[in-house]
Amino acid sequence: MSVLRASAAVFCHAGDFVGPLDFALHAGECRTLVFARGRDASIAARLCAAIVKPTHGALYIGHFDTRLQPPQAKRLVGFVDVAGLRGSRHAFACEVAFRAEVWGLDVARAQLRARETLAAIGDVRDPYARALALALVPEVKLLVFDQPGHPRYRARAAEIAPETAIVETSVVASRLVVPRDFAAVRS
């Protein structure tokens, strides 16, 4: 069974058009979705995490259609935002406790798992590492990275949660190369 299945999933609203996304991802697999703009990458990440609903097509997380059953789909997903998670050590602990309550997890075990995950990632002050540790507190089936700055995050996540499917978005800006002597070309 696929963990994430996109079938011609498209998002279009107020001038933004992202898609179509058309792929399937199984447990333990990784996929990178490449876009020309950061905004498109963020929208695609949110589509894959059931935060944004597709305008057309379908996107399933497990058996759940993200348009019809977003709460059920979201319980299977860990989302790592491009901005990461800023704040003090205390703010991180409070966020872990809050999420543990929302997910119905034991708070002490969630705190321990978050600290262990953060230590395994290696940089306790990095906002993106903190967001990744927070996303991995519950045992999610799908982990979605919104534009990770470094490939080590995906590698660490795959080591920590090898059965978790991983989607990451990336931005590769294309450039038009114009020769220096372009203006000197004669007709």
What are these regions (language model features)?
Residues 43, 72-78:
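ABC transporter nucleotide-binding domains
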Residues 49:
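Helix-to-loop junction immediately C-terminal to a conserved catalytic motif
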Residues 30-40:
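Walker A (P-loop) ATP-phosphate-binding motif of ABC ATPase nucleotide-binding domains
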